[in-house]
Each structure stands twice: as structure tokens, then as C-alpha cells.
Amino acid sequence: MACPKDLIEMDDLVPVARVDTADLTCGECTDCLQMCPGLSPGTHAVEERMFGRARRDDERWLGIYDELVACWALDDAVHSRSGAGGAVSALLAHAMHHLQLDWALVCGRRGDKPWRAAPAICRNPTEVHQYSQSTYQLTPHLIGLYDVLRQEEESRGAIVGLPCHFQALRGIQALASPVGDRARKRVAFTIEIACSSNTLPSGTEALLVDELGLELQHVTRVFYRDATCEGVAYPGVFSAETVDGTRHELPLWRAFRTFKRHKTHRCLSCPDWLSGLTDVSVFDGDPNIFVASVNGTSDYAKHGTVLIRTPLGAAVLRSAQNAGVVGVRQTDLPPGNLGLERKRSRRVLHERGARPIPEPPIPGYVEPGECVDDDELLSVPADIRKHEGEAD
């Protein structure tokens, strides 16, 4: 999307040169390298522009923020359908109304392969709630902006995404090019979701085919954090529906353990649980949904923990609260966040390795401490694994 000559396209998850383009010479252009967070997320420079300063060492993992609150959707249907309380979809839908936005980029599903993630553009606030579910699958998310930035002259919108998406977005916005100018002017509101590492589509396919015994062509819908099934509590289960209307379920902990085998070096070496470069950041209110899934229920009420980073983020939150869209209460950061610990441990491991890795958000920062083995972090008692039919 950042290429001024439009020489790059996506072949599924892989960027490739367009074979239908006569002029494949880049000359001195390095726009794609400048905006790619796989080389450097550019966090230090973006924070200077956004906040007037870069993060301190004690802000290494959460970044710069003004307020930390618990937040959840007050609409029962939105709250029930959501993976973690509906804070993201409720705030996004309200932002579209409050800021008079024309579109919102969210993560949806492919029409031809409903088990595959794909970017989706919502054109009105009511559409947002169709996508109020977690998605644990890689997809070229920002490709969803291609048409709105290149073809719609005046529209403004919002983006929900993961840390790497916003690092790339901020890189695009820093470009001295037409697409950079459009991205600066027309992306008006941003919400990021914390990420310990994303998963290849083969991870979802392994759950459907190997664990549930389904044929992919029979799958019509996939939910990663489904809490609408009878007898299922937060944090939900992995579920799939098939053409005959049957719903098939797996405990969430089994999904997480399967996903471990379907990662990329880029995700595993990523230095950021949160980019810190958005108006709002959100993660689960329960710091360890894996253990909650093993136990069958959470000790926490279903909600999201929200970091407010900008005045605009604060304004949208207060407006949504005053309008009765979300519930808000002050909170502290619960200890023992599994996603953050997995991210930190893998970063320690890869910083000591020989392969190239993305730069950390603080230049030259080296993560202290020891790496905790992921098998230890995702361990499950043998009797529970046997009861749930997990293969050794």
C-alpha cells in the first residue's frame, strides 16, 4: 500500500512484486523499508511526535498512557457476543458516531473461506458489532485501507488492529508521499488490541481438521472466544459451525496449545505486546485466560482493561460512558499477565539468538531476566488433558 509505483501486492500472506507491471525499478525509493515494522517499529520517533517525549525504561512494555480503567459494553447482546466484554466494539461504534466517521477497519472473515481472517470495512456503527470477537489468525490487515485511501477523497475513519498494524500505519503516515498524506489526514481514531503473538492460518485449520475432525468446505463460521454456547463462561471456547447447523467446540486452552506450533519468527521475536502508538489500547481484564479456560471459568468479571493514551481517546471514552454505551471503573494492572509474560520471555530468547529481529521500542534496550519456557507457561494437568482428549 505504501509503494508509490504500486509494484507490490499480497499473495495471501506474502508480499510479492506485481508481474503485470512493466516498470519494476525502485530507483532510490525505500518507502516500503521505512514503514515496515519488521525492520524497525520506529517507536521512539512516533512517540516524540504523539506525546512530545519517548517512553522511559519503566514504560518499556505498556508505553505512555494517562489512565488505566476497566471497561465493558453495557448492551447485553454486545457484551455476550464479545471475547472480553465488548469494550473494543462499543468504543469503536461510539467513536464512529461521536466523531462522525465514514468507515472503520476491523478484522472479519473471507467470504469464500469462512475460517480465514480478512480485513473488513464497516460503513456504519451498527455493522461494528458483527465483528465483536477475538481473531487469532494472521491476515494482511492494512490492505483493507487500500481502496478507502486511494479512491475516497474526503472520507475519515477508524482502525482496530494489533501493535504491528499501528507501527506500520505510523510509518505510512510519516512518508512524504500522497498515500502518507492521506493516511495522516483520514485515519482519525485508533484502538489496538494486545498481542502475545499471532498465528498462521494453519493453526485454525489444525483445530478444525485435526482436533474437531471437520472438513474445511463444511465450515461456515468460526469463533475463537465463543461464550454464547450453553454452559460456557468467560473466557469462552473455540467453536465452529458447519453447513448442517451443528456447533463444534474445543476448550480455549487446547486452541492456545495448538497455536504454539503455527507461529512465525517475526511474531515470536516481536518486541511489543502493545505498540503504545494509538488513542486507546485494550487487553483482557483477566490476566490469565489460559488458566481460566483450564479451570472452566474466570475469577474476573468479563471486561477489558483499557489504556487511554491521548486526549481524543479520553474524549471518546467519556462520551461513551455518558451515553450509557460502556461501563467504566478505575482499576489496577493485575499481576501475572500471561500474554505479556509469554511476549517478554520470547523476546529474551530471541535477543540472545543469532537471527535478525525487530528493534525494541527503546533504542538499545536489552530485556533483563530469564526466558520462561512456553511449555511451562501453557502447562495443563495430565488428567485434564486426558479428559478433554488432547493427544500427547
Where are these regions (language model features)?
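Portal/gating segments that form or line small-molecule/metal binding sites
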Residues: A87-M96, Q100-E152
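Ferredoxin-like iron-sulfur electron-transfer modules
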Residues: M1, D6-E28, T220-Y224, L250-T258
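Short, conserved secondary-structure transition motifs
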Residues: I193-A206, D226-G231
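Long, compositionally biased charged/polar accessory segments in the mid-to-C-terminal portions
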Residues: L101-D102, L212-D392
